[in-house]
């Protein structure tokens, strides 16, 4: 899925902009580091619930998070 490629890149970029490790982000939204790693490597897609949490955490829209212009 094309949005998945944009999402994984956007997620990693947003995380690094905040100087967060995968463990810190995982704790902030209630998932494991492995889940963050799978999302960032495009091995798994987040459920809508986590997209909402991530968008709120990074103060961006879901559209921005998944790369919909």
Give the predicted meaning of each segment.
Residues 67:
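Phosphate-coordinating loops and pocket residues in cytosolic domains that bind phosphorylated ligands
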Residues 9, 19-20, 46-49:
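Residue-level signal for the short linker/turn that defines the boundary of a DNA-recognition helix
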Residues 19-38:
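Short alpha-helical DNA-recognition segment
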């Amino acid at each position: 899925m094309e949005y998945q490629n944009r999402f994984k890149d956007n997620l990693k970029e947003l995380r690094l902009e905040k100087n967060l490790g995968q463990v810190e982000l995982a704790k902030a939204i209630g998932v494991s580091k492995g889940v963050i790693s799978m999302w960032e490597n495009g091995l798994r897609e987040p459920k809508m619930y986590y997209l909402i949490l991530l968008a709120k955490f990074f103060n961006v829209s879901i559209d921005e998070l998944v790369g919909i212009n």
